[in-house]
């Protein structure tokens, strides 16, 4: 403890703060990248005038509260007041729209990534760029404002993301980490800057509007992990820590998006690696060696914090339906007086699934609680379908629900591995699906025919990843790549447990997917008719 106290007192600890959609979390780490203190603040987005937003007051109250909570925990645990830090990094939900005038005034309410009012803009930009521009991207929000003839657009001097905004207020620097920037506007993998050809196409598209700005002039400057990104100003220090204890002059690393910090926290920034987050919703990130050959609207393209191209597949649904079935069986157990806790219930039912037939005996299920753009399903309609010949056993039933939870991810991953020939060495799995040891991991390995690794701990997630990026900026050796730094200095011997795909399981999952694809019309009819 005295050692940690010295580290904090001498300003050698590193701080990462991440704005998630429901929680703002601050994580302080030591020189060995171990979390030594944390603090958090819970917040909720508001739905106002047809848009999802957070107010500036919410943002600043939340930031100060999460920092205060962390600083108080440090005081309580180690008896020391934080005055100096080795470096600070801010990260947040990506995409969305924050536009400011030349005085630094917010011109329109902050639009978060959740807003899907940008359909027309997205459609036009996909056609123009021949590159996927999802609804939540900042450039789609900007162009939708132009299409809607919004009065404020002519006055824009700067637009950025939430992390970029906080960083600007802390340092005065209008910069953004490449990972977060890649969710604003497409990035050129070679220059690690906005794609120049697309910049010119966009300027030409809007030239008739006669705005006093060109798009690159209002976007933040792109930086990569390890770059210096500014110094905490006196004003910034007071905004972060109103007590006045925190001193100005602390270096800041480039602000990043939550996708990038998640990749850092799971050691998945090197090319040919991938990570899959499997909780309430699922997403997979695959780090590519080269750009994809074709345009696929199912795949979002972003980058790692050091600028490698990443293909992202997102599924709106995840373990919600699985949890509902486990709860139903728990209710039955309670009804007959059986004393079974939830951990035992999950363990029993998930492990039972491994006893089932590799193709689930013909049982088909869908766990959609929300619509799925990738499979063209508009609403949530959880469903189980079987024929009289189906082998209707508990093992097959549970296996089909584990299989279907990964269905959308499988469709997207097949586009990458089968259509595009993308090669993946290992996938790192994290999230609720992997809590029951070995089960979700085996199902995923068979589904995507790739070895899956699960770490014993996933650290502190995104804010921990952001603190690591802050430390990397200060500590990296000359020319040391982020992937090497993570492998050698952060994760070291923590290789996790690995499960390889099993040929019978792979064939069984492929057979299940044939039925899954055929049954999608039934799911769509349920959306239309029920």
Place the predicted regions along the sequence by residue.
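Conserved small-residue
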Residues: 26-28, 33, 88, 115, ...
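Short glycine/proline- and acidic residue-enriched helix-loop micro-motifs
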Residues: 52, 126-130, 218
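N-terminal glycine/serine-rich phosphate-binding loop of ATP-dependent small-molecule kinases
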Residues: 1-108, 155, 216, 238, ...
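Conserved beta-strand -> loop -> alpha-helix junction used to position metal-binding or nucleic-acid-contacting
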Residues: 110-120
């Amino acid at each position: 403890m005295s050692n940690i106290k010295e580290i904090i007192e001498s300003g050698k600890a590193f701080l990462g703060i991440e704005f998630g959609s429901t929680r703002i979390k601050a994580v302080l780490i030591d020189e060995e990248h171990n979390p030594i203190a944390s603090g958090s603040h819970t917040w909720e987005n508001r739905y106002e005038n047809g848009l999802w937003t957070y107010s500036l007051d919410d943002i600043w109250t939340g930031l100060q509260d999460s920092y205060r909570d962390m600083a108080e925990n440090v005081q309580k645990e180690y008896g020391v007041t934080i005055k100096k830090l080795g470096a600070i990094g801010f990260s947040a939900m990506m995409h969305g729209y924050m536009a400011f005038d030349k005085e630094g005034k917010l011109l329109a309410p902050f639009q978060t990534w959740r807003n899907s009012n940008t359909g027309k803009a997205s459609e036009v930009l996909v056609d123009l760029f021949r590159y996927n521009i999802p609804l939540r991207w900042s450039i789609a929000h900007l162009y939708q404002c132009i299409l809607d003839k919004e009065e404020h657009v002519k006055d824009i001097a700067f637009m950025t993301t939430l992390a970029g905004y906080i960083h600007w207020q802390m340092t005065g620097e209008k910069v953004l980490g490449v990972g977060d920037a890649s969710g604003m506007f497409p990035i050129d993998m070679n220059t690690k800057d906005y794609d120049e050809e697309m910049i010119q196409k966009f300027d030409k598209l809007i030239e008739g509007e006669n705005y006093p700005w060109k798009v690159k002039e209002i976007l933040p400057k792109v930086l990569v992990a390890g770059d210096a990104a500014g110094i905490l100003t006196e004003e910034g220090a007071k905004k972060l820590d109103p007590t006045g204890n925190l001193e100005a002059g602390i270096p800041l690393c480039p602000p990043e998006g939550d996708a990038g910090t998640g990749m850092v926290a799971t050691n998945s920034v090197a090319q040919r690696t991938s990570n899959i987050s499997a909780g309430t919703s699922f997403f997979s990130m695959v780090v590519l060696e080269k750009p994809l050959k074709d345009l696929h609207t199912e795949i979002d393209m972003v980058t790692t914090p050091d600028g490698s191209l990443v293909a992202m597949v997102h599924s709106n649904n995840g373990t919600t339906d699985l949890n509902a079935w486990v709860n139903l069986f728990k209710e039955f157990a309670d009804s007959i007086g059986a004393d079974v806790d939830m951990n035992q219930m999950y363990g029993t039912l998930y492990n039972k699934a491994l006893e089932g037939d590799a193709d689930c005996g013909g049982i088909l299920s869908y766990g959609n609680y929300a619509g799925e753009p990738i499979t063209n399903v508009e609403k949530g309609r959880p469903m189980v379908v079987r024929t009289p010949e189906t082998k209707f056993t508990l093992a097959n039933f549970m296996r089909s629900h584990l299989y279907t939870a990964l269905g959308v991810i499988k469709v997207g991953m097949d586009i990458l591995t089968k259509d595009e020939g993308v090669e993946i060495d290992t996938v790192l799995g994290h999230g609720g699906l992997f809590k029951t040891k070995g089960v979700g991991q085996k199902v995923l390995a068979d589904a995507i025919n790739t070895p899956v690794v699960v770490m014993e701990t996933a650290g502190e997630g995104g804010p921990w990843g952001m603190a690591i990026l802050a430390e990397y900026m200060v500590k990296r050796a000359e020319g040391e790549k982020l992937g090497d730094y993570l492998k050698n200095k952060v994760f070291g011997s923590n290789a996790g447990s690995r499960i390889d795909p099993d040929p019978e399981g792979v064939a069984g999952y492929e057979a299940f997917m044939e039925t899954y694809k055929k049954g999608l019309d039934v799911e769509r009819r349920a959306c239309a008719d029920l």
